[in-house]
């Protein structure tokens, strides 16, 4: 279920402060964050945000199509290695 419109979008304050500081200074260095629950705001466009996926920080370059989505959507937490192959079917 989406968030109520009367509440508005959510962003962690510490991340918002880092984004505003980077926009003011024009710094292009990636912003490291563990806040996967924060919503992408329009003032983040053009910044690189390193989102933690549980093991490492995944660099995410924010574009205008990402606005309104959560940061965690762009840093997958699970790796899919495929199902085990059936050895009987391979011999035929």
Swiss-Prot record:
InterPro entries: Ribosomal_uS19, Ribosomal_uS19_bac-type, Ribosomal_uS19_CS, Ribosomal_uS19_SF. Keywords: Ribonucleoprotein, Ribosomal protein, RNA-binding, rRNA-binding. It comes from the Bacteria. Transmembrane segments: none annotated. GO terms for biological process: ribosomal small subunit assembly; translation. GO terms for molecular function: rRNA binding; structural constituent of ribosome. The keyword Ribonucleoprotein applies. Gene3D superfamilies: 30s Ribosomal Protein S19, Chain A (3.30.860.10). Pfam families: Ribosomal_S19. One of its GO terms (cellular component) is cytoplasm. NCBIfam families: rpsS_bact. Protein S19 forms a complex with S13 that binds strongly to the 16S ribosomal RNA. Belongs to the universal ribosomal protein uS19 family. This is Small ribosomal subunit protein uS19. It comes from Yersinia pseudotuberculosis serotype I (strain IP32953).
């Amino acid at each position: 279920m989406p968030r109520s419109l009367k509440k508005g979008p959510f962003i962690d304050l510490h991340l918002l402060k880092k984004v505003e500081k980077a926009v003011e200074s024009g710094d292009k260095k990636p912003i490291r964050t563990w806040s996967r629950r924060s919503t992408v705001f329009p003032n983040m466009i053009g910044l690189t945000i390193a989102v933690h996926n549980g093991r490492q920080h995944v660099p995410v370059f924010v574009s205008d199509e990402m606005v309104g989505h959560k940061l965690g959507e762009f840093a997958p937490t699970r790796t899919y290695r495929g199902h085990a192959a059936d050895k009987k079917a391979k011999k035929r």
